[in-house]
C-alpha cells in the first residue's frame, strides 16, 4: 500500500489481542518505535539516548483528614481548570453523565457543553441527563445521536487516524463528539485521567472478593486448579481469577484474549512476550504498595497512555480540535499521589445490608461540594464509561454479516484460524456468550490492516 510500506510487526498483533491496544514500544510497523510516556530522547553522534523526565510516586500522607483532602482537591482542581481555560479563543467542555466531565463542566463555567449518545435506551444515551445538567448550571448543551450506520461507516477513517489499531469502541463516539464541538470552537476540556489518579475504576474495588482473598494462598491456588478443569462460567471464573495473585490476573482495564486463547486463534507464530513480562517492570516499581495502588500505577503507565489519552489525542486532532485534560495537571497529580488508599476506594456498608465499595471517594466528595445541589447526585452515580451498543449490533443481520465477511476474508485467513473467529461470532449471536469485545478487537485490527496494507486509498469522511 502507498499509505505505509513498512512490514507488519506480528508480535504487536499478538499483544494487541490481549490488551486491545499496542502496549510495547515497537509499533505495529516493524522497526518503528514509540517514545515511552514521560521520556525524551537526545540523538547525537549516531547514538540515541532515552531518558525519563517524570514519574508518579504514590506515598500516602496520613496526617490530613478526609475533609482536608476534599478541600485540597477542590482548591487544586479549581486552579487547574482555570489554567486550562486560558486561550485566545472560546473554550467548551465535553459532558457525559459521569462525575469527571460533570465536575469539569461545572467548574469551568464555559458557555457550551457537548454530548453524544446512541438510540433511546438510557444506558447507551446520556444526552437527556447532559441537557438537564447543562440547564442546571446555566449552559447550552449541544448533542448528537449517533446512528448505527454512520458509526460503522466511519470505522476505516477512524482506524486510519489512530495510526495503530485500537479496539476501544468509545474511540468512535469520541470522534463524533470532537466533530460536534469542532463545528463551533477549537478548544475543549475533558475529564480523562480522573479514574487513574483518584482510583475510579470499578475493578479497583472488585466488590465481594475481599473475604475470599483472606483464605490462605495455598488453599485458593488449590481451588483455582480444580476450577480450571471445569467448564467456564461466571462462578468458576471467580475461583480461577481469585486463585491468582494480582500480578497474574490484572494487566490493566482491558483483558481480551488470554495468552493461551490468542495462540489458539492465531495461525501465525510470533515472538511476542507474555503479558506478565510486559507488566512486571511496572509491578516491580510498586512492590510494597497495596493492590489498589498497584492497579492504578499499572493503568497510569499502560492503559491511560495506550488507550485513554491515545484516542483522545488522535480523535481530537482528526477534527482539528485541541483537547485539554485538567485532571492531569502536574499539581493535581502531585496531590493525588499523596491521598491514602482508604480515601480513594472506600468500603461503606449500606442501610440495606450490602457492602458496596465507592471508588474515587474523596474526589466525589469534592465534586459534590463544588456542584450545584440539584446536580450533585452525579457525584454518587455509578461509572458507565462511554457505553456503545456493540453487543446489540453484532446480533443484527447487517452487522453480523459485515463482520462475518471480514472474518472469512483474505487478511483474516492470513493471520487467524477463521473458523474460530466465526465461532466467536455465532456463539455471541446465539446468546451463548458475550463475545462482543473479543470480536471487536479482531475486527478493528482487520479494518486497520485493510487501510494500511491492502488499500491504496486514504479513507475520508463517508457521506452517511
PLM regions and their residue ranges:
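Active-site adenylate/phosphate-handling loop in enzymes that bind or generate adenylated species
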Residues: 176-234, 303, 309-332
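Membrane-proximal basic amphipathic "stem/tether" segments
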Residues: 210-254, 443, 459
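Short catalytic/ligand-binding loop motif for oxyanion handling, primarily in non-cytosolic enzymes
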Residues: 61, 101, 196-200, 205, ...
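Donor nucleotide-sugar recognition loop
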Residues: 165-169
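Cysteine-centered catalytic environments shared across enzyme families
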Residues: 1-162, 174, 178, 368, ...
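Short low-complexity, flexible loop/linker segments enriched in glycine and/or proline
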Residues: 156-160, 182, 204-206, 391-393
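Adenosyl-5′-phosphate
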Residues: 4, 31-37, 47-48, 170, ...
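Gly/Ser/Thr-rich beta-alpha loop segments that engage phosphate groups in nucleotides
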Residues: 33, 94, 99-100, 193-195, ...
